Structure formats: C-alpha cells, structure tokens
Amino acid sequence: MKAISVLGSTGSIGTQTLQIVDDFPDQFRVVALTAGRNLALLVEQIQRHQPELVALADEALLPELKQRLEALDPSDRPAQCPEMVGGPDGLEVAASWGSAELVVTGIVGCAGLLPTLAAVRAGKDLALANKETLIAAGPVVLPELKKSGSRLLPADSEHSAIFQCLQGTPWADTARLSTGVPTPGLRRIQLTASGGAFRDWNAADLEKATVADATSHPNWSMGRKITVDSASLMNKGLEVIEAHYLFGLDYDHIEIVIHPQSIIHSMVEMADSSVLAQLGWPDMKLPILYCLSWPSRLETPWRRLDLTEVGQLSFRAPDPNKYPCMELAYAAGRAGGTMPAVMNAANEEAVAQFLEERIHFLDIPEVIEAACERHKPDLMAHPQLDDVLEVDQWARTAVREQVSRGTTRIPGPAVAA
C-alpha cells in the first residue's frame, strides 16, 4: 500500500486524488493533508482518511480547525487526532513527511513552489500538478532533482500523455522527468488544447467577455484560475515551458494544437517520423491515477472510450491574435532565466484581478506584457531560489500597482533581481 501526502487537498486536484484513494483503498493510504481555508471539507477529509499530519497554509486557522474536530460527535472523530501545523513551514513539513512515499502537489500557482522543493529535497517522488514550480523555478528545481533522486511524474493530462507515450520507447527509463536533458528519439511534442471557454468566439467579441464566460469550460472541470488560463490559452503556454523542462526539447519543437473534443491529450513525434498519442475521455482522475500507480496500471470501472461515440476528431492551429497570452509564454520561455517567473507571477495576479472584476479579460495580456518588458533589463540568466522569489514578488506588486492606477504600462524602476 502506497503512502501519499496530498498538498492542496481541498482543491480540484486534491479532491480528485482523494476520490481515487476511496476507489482503491487497498492500494493507497493518506498520511498527510494540506489545505487553505475550506475547513469544512478538510474536516470531512480528516474523518475519512485519518492522516498522520494536517497542515494549514494560514496558521491562524489552526485553533478553528481544532475546535471543529473537537466539536464532532465522538463516534465521528478520527481514531487518532492528527498532528497539526501551519504556515509556510507547516506546508514544507507535510511535503517532506517521513512516511510519505509519493507527494501529490495540487497547490495552485507559485504558492506550491517551496513545498514542492521541500518534497524534492526530502527525496520524495512527486505527482506534479503544480506546473508553476517548473515554470518559475526550473533552473532551481532540476539540479535539486538530480541531487535527491526524486522522480517527477506529471499529473496534468497533457504531460501525462507525453510521459505515457514515451513509456513505450526503448528509452523509457530516461523518461522519468528528473534531468531536463533531451529525451532520446523524441523529435516533436504537440500539446492539444480544447480552446477553452472562448474557442468559438470571434476575437472582436472578447471585449465583452465576463468572469462567468471565462470560467465556464466546455470540457473539463477545473478551478477558476486554471479555467481562465484555459480561456486565454495561457495554460497551454505554461505547459509549453513545463514540457521544455520535463522533456528537454527546444521551444521550436513544442507545438500547440486546438483539439475541441479533448480526446487526444497530447502527441509525440519520434525520430522515425511516427507519431504516438494517448487518448481518453477528459477526466483528470486518469492522469492522477497513473501517477499514483506508476509503473503499474490499475483496472478501473470508469467510462471507457468509444471512438464511434465520439464520431470525429478535429484540429486547428491557434490564432495568435486571439490568444496573445500563448505568444507571451513562448517569448518568456525563450528568454529563460527569471523571465518565466515574472510572466507567471504577472499572470497569476492579472487573473486574480480579473476574477475580482477589477480589469477586463483583454487586459490580462496587456499587464503581463508590461511586466515582462519592464523586467528585461534585470533578467537573470542563472537565478537562485531567492532570485526567483524576489522577481515573483516584484511582478505581483507591479501588476497590482498598475491596476490600481488604471495604466497600461508598469512605471517606475524595476526591483533589482
């Protein structure tokens, strides 16, 4: 039975991971959980899974969590009360918890960077759903992986698809995603994208896009932030950078293809020009399960793919004029160094401002581009962790100040990186 820690247990990835644990009680057990502010759901998870440790991102909420557990009927309380910790240090304790064999990193955004690094430094295998870890800090994370021997297993559908395709090659042992060096025999990656909430909209109509429009995904059930990223195609741009670090390909050999049906989750072209693809219904539990069970596969009762039911699969190239965030991500990835961290932080803050209805949907790429342009003179090619954290905070502050002024440019001197 594999012992797992779930970082971000009350979020989309976390709840689906725990559903899998429920489906396979003889295969997995939960030893640690971390959460944000959803204490009601966390209490239910503690009751059901009885972890050894629980960590809250906000340490101030620990007394309330303890009160909620103490208020339970004695018959509903966990057999043994878990150890409870809080704050950033508490998250890192959960990420490196001694009895955990695999850590599922479901914390959204750059907030997941330090806990993920803690898991890597502790030598834990990771089911990586927090793509921002590699995007913002790939130059920092990859050397740590080499030192610790941790294995990265991608928990998002696209990179899981690539990983699964590579398991069938003679070089499967090199596809463990722990070095960042080019994967032998791999010529090209094609990341498929649903096109998001606005795939059938004209570019001119995006001026009228609302938060409700942007958070209504046609195929996938995801959190609000990632659903907005899907609508702007920033999510796919971030995945391009992640694929660059995971599989070692140059950006010119990583492509995005709009595939509205979301049946093909990604494709790889090998050196002999053959193309391998992984197919399935759009269900995040499938790539998460593969992370948990790898290198084995577990039989499931889940819905099986019937291509005659699908009927047809269609593909088209994304329009860069409609999806400027995609182009910004490619540019940041090619610039390298601290630029992806700035781009990612600016996007996270811009999306947060959009969800609060302080800016319009089309303002998101404007503020991201402004932050990236302002950072160019201070770009660091080979950053350390402190450098990444510093530029991350600078970009967030710059976007907030820009939005508060209602300007389209980020004024003032850049914070030295």
Swiss-Prot record:
Family named by the database record: Belongs to the DXR family.
Pathway: Isoprenoid biosynthesis; isopentenyl diphosphate biosynthesis via DXP pathway; isopentenyl diphosphate from 1-deoxy-D-xylulose 5-phosphate: step 1/6
Entry function: Catalyzes the NADPH-dependent rearrangement and reduction of 1-deoxy-D-xylulose-5-phosphate (DXP) to 2-C-methyl-D-erythritol 4-phosphate (MEP).
Positions annotated to bind NADPH: T10, G11, S12, I13, G36, R37, N38, N130, E132, G223
PANTHER family in the record: 1-DEOXY-D-XYLULOSE 5-PHOSPHATE REDUCTOISOMERASE, 1-DEOXY-D-XYLULOSE 5-PHOSPHATE REDUCTOISOMERASE, CHLOROPLASTIC
Name recorded for this polypeptide: 1-deoxy-D-xylulose 5-phosphate reductoisomerase
InterPro entries: DXP_reductoisomerase, DXP_reductoisomerase_C, DXP_reductoisomerase_N, DXPR_C, DXPR_C_sf, NAD(P)-bd_dom_sf
Pfam family, one: DXP_redisom_C
Binding site for Mn(2+): D156, E158, E239
Reaction equations catalysed: 2-C-methyl-D-erythritol 4-phosphate + NADP(+) = 1-deoxy-D-xylulose 5-phosphate + NADPH + H(+)
Segments crossing the lipid bilayer: none
Cysteines engaged in disulfide bonds, as pairs: none
Originating organism: Synechococcus sp. (strain CC9902)
MF annotations from Gene Ontology: 1-deoxy-D-xylulose-5-phosphate reductoisomerase activity; manganese ion binding; NADPH binding
Gene: dxr
Family matches, as HAMAP family: DXP_reductoisom
Keyword entries, A-Z: Isoprene biosynthesis, Manganese, Metal-binding, NADP, Oxidoreductase
E.C. code: 1.1.1.267
Chain sites annotated for binding 1-deoxy-D-xylulose 5-phosphate: K131, S157, E158, S194, H217, S230, N235, K236, E239
GO terms (BP aspect): isopentenyl diphosphate biosynthetic process, methylerythritol 4-phosphate pathway involved in terpenoid biosynthetic process
Cofactor dependency: Mg(2+); Mn(2+)
